Each structure stands twice: as structure tokens, then as C-alpha cells.
Amino acid sequence: MKKVGIIGGSGYTGGELIRLVLQHPALELEFVYSTTRAGKPLTHAHPDLLGSTTRKFTDQVNPEIDVVYLCLGHGNSVAFLQEHSFSDHTLIVDLGNDFRLKEDANFEGRNFVYGLPELQREAIEKANAIANPGCFATALQLAMLPLAKNNNLKSDVHAHATTGSTGAGVGLSSTSHFSWRNNNFSW
């Protein structure tokens, strides 16, 4: 059984990942890191987990963990990894955007592999660091994959995509209020 740690577990991404790990037969949730909620039950941030876990948030990490997921806001994974080191055998999966671009993929001896298992399975299986694609990149790649495999992409692809507000995280900002987001499209 692989032991898993989640960094930034109080947000939407962290909450969904906690739920998936708790239900996975080959994974064991060892810790969920949050400096703002340390000592509080996970269910305070994620009431949908009531009855699934009694675990609490912690401000401690296990550097020998098998897998660590970074569920931090964009731009925060680099800073976290500069302050916290993990064993060479630890698989690091960044769900933010810090390591998605090739020029950012090499970090302190690790080469972050970007991609989806459907497209880069072999490279991901060998990796000790993974940069997970964002929601739009994932949706577009999965939608176009069957066409690309059959050589049916004959011209440029143009996509129009709309996002909700959960991608912005749980923190409030001037752009996360309904009155600002309602019918607010940029062209």
C-alpha cells in the first residue's frame, strides 16, 4: 500500500483528492498539510467527508512519504518545495501550474513530466515528479485524442471554453463574487 501526503488539503482540489485517496484500495492517506487549519478535523473544511475519516490537518510533513500531492495555488509549489525536501523515492505530483512549462520542469534535481496518462503513460510511469495538466488542457487533449490518433486533425483547432469559479480556489477575491462572474465573458 502506498502512503500518500496531501499539501494544501483545505481547498477544492485537495478535498476531492482526499476523497479519492480514502476510497482507493492501494493508497493510505498519511497526512493532509495545511498551516491555516492544523489540528482541525478535515471535515471542518470538507463536510462531505463526514463518516469517511476522523483525520485532522497537520502542519508537519513526512519527507519519506511514497507520494505527495501539491494542491497549492498557482505559484506556491516552488516556494513549498524550497522549504520542504522529500526523499528521492518520493513521487511528487503538482496539481498547480508551477512545473507545466518546459523551462520550469527541472527543479532541484527532479525533472517534472507534464501530461496525461492517456498520452504520456510510459514517461509518467518512470517519473519521480509529475506536472498535472490544468482543466482546460485536460479537456481539450482528451477531446482531441481520438481525432489525433486517427489523423483526423487536418487544420488548426480553435476552442471556446468557459470556467466556473472553483478553479480560483476557496479564498474570496474581487473576481470570485457571483455579481462579477455572472455573464462575464472575455473575447
Show which residues each predicted segment covers.
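N-terminal Rossmann-like NAD(P) cofactor-binding subdomain of oxidoreductases
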Residues: M1-W187
